[in-house]
Amino acid sequence: LAIEPVAEHRMFFFVRQGHPLVAAREHSLETILVFPLVSPRLPQRMAVHLGKDAAHARVDRETGDLTPSLMVDSFAVARNAVMAGDAVGLAPLVALEQDVRTREISLLPFTAPWLQLSYGLFYTRKRPLSRVAQLFMTQLRQVEVVLQAREQRALARLDGKKRTRRSAKRKARTAAEPAARVAKSTTAPARRARTRQ
């Protein structure tokens, strides 16, 4: 067989707005996977990390693949399951982009180098590809170029939002510090005056 890698996409855990994990302070795998996982069957390279923490999921002994709590092959079905309850979904950012913008779903701040969707094409080396198959491969790669660019823009927006939130928190802390100093300095003379009386 000849195998041609096509693309890689970062995967994100996502939940509905108002989900208990949105307000959680910790987002470890252990914390996230307390909730049912909704996704397609996951390959062994992900299963070795998710298998021990994913409640009600099981690892296939022969393939090493992970069958999640709720296995679905359609993103629309996975999204609906996540929106209807407390399940956690797993998908690439390009699939979630619109829902993130409208704030219907929330991405959980968990990243790992192994949390990637990788796919490719395979065919028999001995048999030459038909012109239709070659055309399909060319068009698929062109679509992927567009998707990769969209994904990079969406990631940049996410990083920008995180930075804005961090700087806003810093500014709020910095603004609160002088007020706290002034309050301390005004209470100190008052205490001294009381002790003199």
Residue map of PLM features:
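Alpha-helical segments flanking ligand/cofactor-binding loops in enzyme cores
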Residues: E4, E30, R79-N80, Q134
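Polybasic, lysine-enriched low-complexity intrinsically disordered terminal tails
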Residues: Q152-Q197
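Hydrophobic hinge/microswitch elements
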Residues: P43-L108
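A bilobed periplasmic-binding-protein/Venus flytrap-type ligand-binding module shared by bacterial periplasmic
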Residues: F14-P20, S118-L129
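Short beta-strand-centered segments that line the small-molecule binding cleft or hinge
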Residues: L1-M11, V15, M83, S106-L108
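Short secondary-structure boundary/capping segments
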Residues: A2-P5, S28-E30, D60-E62, E97, ...
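Secondary-structure junction motif
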Residues: L21, H27-L29, F35-E62, L129-A133, ...
